[in-house]
């Protein structure tokens, strides 16, 4: 089994109150050379599912750490990760920027879901609607190596948690307002109308900031996919039924919400090369008992939907600074297709793989 340890670009040289954050971040950008590898870590299990580890496999060629695709833009490859909290309320759809994100995490919040969209390859202009963060974001996003965290604030408890984290805090209504060029769209009602420019948010990276590590293991070029044939997956998320359906023509999964195509405002139906389902426990947030908090360290059930197939296994993660380790039931690594990935943080018994 491979450990998804920190690998920095090999060979590259609280409920949603919109109160303000108080921490300012650095505002200059610089390109830095990063180390080839870091030692693999040994994941530990917090339940009956145990896991072992070996050293991380180094890709045969330099790849983008959030997609596994070959590097075509060296400047983008040196950027830090940018996380934008994006609204999924019905009045916020269609959103802007989802089909430009390298990775999107879908989290349950308060009878809704919210997206943590992660960018490095692309700078989405515009991106949004941007909403508040949650305490679960601190644990979930720690493996991205001190990302820029773009949000609209949160209740006092959430704001304290985010400001105390290792994120570069970018509240688009306060300390990041100028750099992000944030604005309220006139064609939607608040609070579902707050947008920013991703290119501006990237300028908030502090001097010396480095790219994120590789987050998943990917199939090599020409390597056959494994697993059982599957047409996709149905998920019962909080407040919305989600379906991902495989399109053999494009090799991508297309997203549906409550029976309707889920669209990006500029780029058509939301799609992804991979859909990773992590079955997690949700507990009440320590700062707001009405807000669910996904537990993303420990271990749990996992599914990888890729190339029209599904592989079932286990996720493990012993620390928030480490990426998830995905291991199939037969003990082999769960491999993704290079490309964009959506990660669904699903509750127990909410996942139904579809037949071929």
Q: PLM ranges: what are they?
A:
Residues 8-11:
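C-terminal motif of bacterial Sec signal peptides marking the signal peptidase cleavage site
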Residues 19-59:
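Extracellular mucin-like PTS domains
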Residues 1-5:
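Sec-dependent N-terminal signal peptides
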Residues 53, 58-101, 105, 110-356:
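A surface/extracellular/periplasmic glyco- and lipid-processing/surface-interacting theme
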Residues 13-16:
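Bacterial signal peptide processing site
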């Amino acid at each position: 089994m491979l450990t998804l340890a920190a690998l920095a670009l090999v060979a590259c040289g609280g409920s949603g109150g919109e109160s303000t954050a108080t921490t300012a971040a650095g505002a200059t950008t610089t390109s830095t050379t990063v180390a080839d590898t870091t030692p693999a870590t040994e994941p530990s299990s917090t339940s009956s599912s145990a896991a072992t580890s070996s050293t991380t496999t180094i890709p045969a060629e330099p790849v983008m750490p959030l997609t596994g695709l070959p590097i075509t833009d060296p400047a983008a490859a040196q950027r830090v990760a940018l996380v934008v909290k994006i609204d999924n309320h019905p009045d916020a759809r269609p959103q802007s920027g989802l089909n430009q994100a390298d990775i999107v995490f879908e989290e349950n919040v308060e009878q809704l879901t919210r997206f943590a969209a992660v960018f490095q390859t692309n700078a989405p202009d515009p991106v949004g609607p941007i909403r508040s963060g949650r305490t679960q974001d601190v644990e979930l996003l720690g493996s991205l190596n001190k990302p820029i965290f773009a949000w609209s604030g949160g209740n006092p408890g959430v704001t304290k948690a985010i400001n105390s984290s290792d994120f570069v805090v970018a509240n688009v209504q306060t300390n990041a307002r100028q750099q992000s060029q944030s604005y309220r769209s006139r064609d939607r009602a608040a609070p579902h109308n707050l947008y920013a420019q991703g290119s501006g948010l990237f300028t908030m990276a502090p001097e010396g900031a480095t790219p994120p590590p590789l987050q998943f293991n990917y199939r090599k070029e020409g390597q056959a996919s494994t697993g059982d044939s599957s047409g996709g997956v149905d998920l019962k998320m909080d407040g919305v039924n989600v379906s991902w359906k495989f399109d053999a023509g494009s090799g991508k999964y297309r997203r549906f919400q409550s029976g309707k195509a889920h669209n990006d405002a500029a780029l058509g139906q939301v799609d992804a090369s991979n859909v990773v389902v992590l079955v997690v426990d949700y507990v009440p947030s320590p700062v707001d008992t009405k807000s669910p908090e996904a537990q993303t360290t420990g271990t749990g059930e996992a599914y990888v939907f890729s190339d029209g197939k599904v592989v079932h296994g286990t996720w493990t993660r012993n620390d928030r600074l480490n990426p998830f380790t995905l291991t199939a039931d037969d003990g082999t690594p769960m491999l993704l297709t290079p490309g964009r990935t959506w990660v669904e943080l699903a509750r127990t018994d909410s996942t139904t793989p579809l037949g071929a």
